[in-house]
């Protein structure tokens, strides 16, 4: 954990999936009866998580993604194979964009609109027929996500027009889908070239997603605003926050 003072590991740019993989590697060396080197077959999932979490692709992260793509090309997971199939992607054309723009959005659509268990069930599926059925369902969910995302983005852009002179854009409205506001924040940030917070207002609390631009750290901004928020966290590029509606 790079945030621990006594951490002596030389690479500091892991996030969730990278730390989980290091744990697996450590267990591999300490538990008896496990074939040596078999953790490499998890690298397809490590690569997927690394790219989709917008982690810096340097050093070990870059190596994990490179070898993860090689593992994925062998298509040993029926679920990911089926998901590539419904998206029309050939195995020899897989690259980091495939992870971030083809597989990632379809897997994430489950958690954004329904439950993340749908995506997990696909990844764990060992049956080709079942995998195809689940992949088709996630593909349709992703299409629905795009429609709702476009609607929220259009409304957010309209609100942003009134705040173009602000150094940071903080845009909110009632009942925007929590699972989609992160994507909307990215799109608004890309258009206006400014750090962006997209916030969904509920009855009492508001839930927001932030995306950074330039040297601005949204995680630091949330940390410094601790007097105004209920909870929040993330990293320099992306973060989430919960606060009282009246504190927006």
Regions found by a protein language model. Give the residues of each.
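Hydrophobic, small-residue-rich alpha-helical packing segments that form membrane-like cores
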Residues: 1-19, 29-32, 37-40
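Generic recognition of well-ordered alpha-helical segments
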Residues: 19-26, 224
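Hydrophobic helix-and-loop "lid/oligomerization" segment in the mid-to-C-terminal part
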Residues: 28-247
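Low-complexity, compositionally biased segments
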Residues: 4-10, 21, 47, 56, ...
């Amino acid at each position: 954990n790079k945030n621990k003072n006594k951490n002596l590991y030389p690479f500091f740019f892991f996030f969730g999936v990278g730390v989980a993989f290091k744990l697996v590697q450590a267990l591999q060396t300490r538990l008896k009866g496990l074939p040596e080197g078999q953790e490499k077959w998890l690298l397809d999932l490590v690569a997927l998580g690394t790219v989709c979490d917008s982690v810096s692709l340097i050093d070990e992260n870059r190596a994990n993604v490179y070898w993860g793509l090689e593992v994925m090309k062998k298509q040993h997971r029926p679920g990911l194979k089926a998901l590539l199939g419904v998206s029309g992607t050939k195995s020899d054309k897989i690259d980091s964009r495939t992870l971030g723009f083809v597989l990632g959005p379809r897997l994430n659509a489950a958690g954004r609109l329904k439950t993340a268990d749908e995506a997990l069930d696909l990844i764990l599926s060992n049956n080709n027929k079942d995998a195809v059925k689940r992949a088709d369902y996630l593909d349709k969910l992703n299409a629905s996500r795009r429609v709702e995302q476009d609607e929220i983005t259009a409304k957010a852009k309209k609100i942003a027009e009134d705040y173009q002179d602000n150094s940071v854009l903080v845009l909110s409205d009632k009942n925007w889908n929590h699972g989609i506001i992160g994507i909307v924040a990215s799109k608004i940030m890309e258009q206006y070239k400014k750090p962006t917070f997209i916030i969904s207002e509920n009855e009492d609390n508001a839930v927001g997603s932030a995306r950074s631009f330039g040297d601005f750290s949204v995680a630091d901004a949330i940390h410094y605003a601790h007097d105004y928020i209920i909870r929040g966290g993330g990293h320099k590029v992306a973060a989430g926050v919960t606060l009282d509606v009246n504190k927006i």
